[in-house]
Amino acid sequence: MPLVRRSVAAASSLIEAGSLTDHLVDQFVHRMGYHPSKSEVKSWDMSIRVLVGDLQDAGLESVEMLLEYRLPLNSKRADVVLCGVHPRTGEESYVVVELKQWNTAIPVDGTDDVIFSESFNQPRLHPVEQVRAYCEYIADMVGMLDGEGEKLAGAAYLHNAVDEAVAGLFLMEPSQHGQLFTSSRRQEFLKFLRSRLDQKPGADAADALLNSAIKPSTQLLAVAADEVQRREQFTLLDEQQVAYSIVMRAVNRAYGANTKQVVVITGGPGSGKSVIALSLMGELARRGRTVMHATGSSALGLMHE
């Protein structure tokens, strides 16, 4: 879910009234229970203003903006997800945009995807790799996409930087899910946006994304099942196999009766709770069921739908 959802035109009106950033802060406090950092608030105030202006210049005022979109079942947030209609196919089209205020940045020696800048005091993930991963994660976890990334595109927009100041970042190969733009390439950025989004209203596309079931894609489940089932070290012993069988029985009964059951497996450190959960995950995924596991700092639980 985003902190704020508005059309480009509506977001522009809030910016002119000086209230968009305040609205983002209010929603952040309401959702998270604490105040965002000063740097984050400054980023909202400056970067979103630039993006909205670019979208207006591209003639995309009816596109829907999801500001600070939280990734499904994850604490990470994409800066902006633009929702609209693809100008060629007429289907839903989404553009994930990561906004950076950096003036300079260079690759870290010996790495392909780590960068450093005077704007921050520690290494960061290359913004193209960041937005690419966000696109792939969304495709894998949003049911309406089911692992198909064709409706998604990604862009890292360094709107304060010129090409010369971040030249090393262009060494990373661009793709549909990850492209790099700077202030020097603003016209290319507008062309990119128009290639992915039509002038038609994007409200329906936003509704489709936000109302979609959250579940791992068929492709992701197949990979998980294959990976887990191939690991010979997941041999269940004694009570572990008993617990596994009890859970499978509960799943089968719940599935047949269209009900829900909760099975709690207890045990100390090293007793095999995680092994049981991963074995269940692999077997259920292999059977074509929607299955997810969520981990805490000291335990791993299994969620099955």
Region roles according to the model:
Residues 1-208:
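Accessory nucleic-acid engagement/destabilization modules that flank
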Residues 113-122, 225-233, 261-266:
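Glycine- and acidic
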Residues 217, 232-261:
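N-terminal pre-P-loop "Q-motif" helix
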Residues 261-301:
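Conserved RecA-like ASCE P-loop NTPase motor core of nucleic-acid helicases/translocases
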Residues 205-241:
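Charged, amphipathic alpha-helical linker segments immediately N-terminal to NTP-binding catalytic cores
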Residues 136, 249-252, 282-286:
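Short, well-ordered alpha-helices that flank and scaffold nucleotide-derived cofactor binding pockets
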Residues 303-305:
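P-loop NTPase switch/communication element
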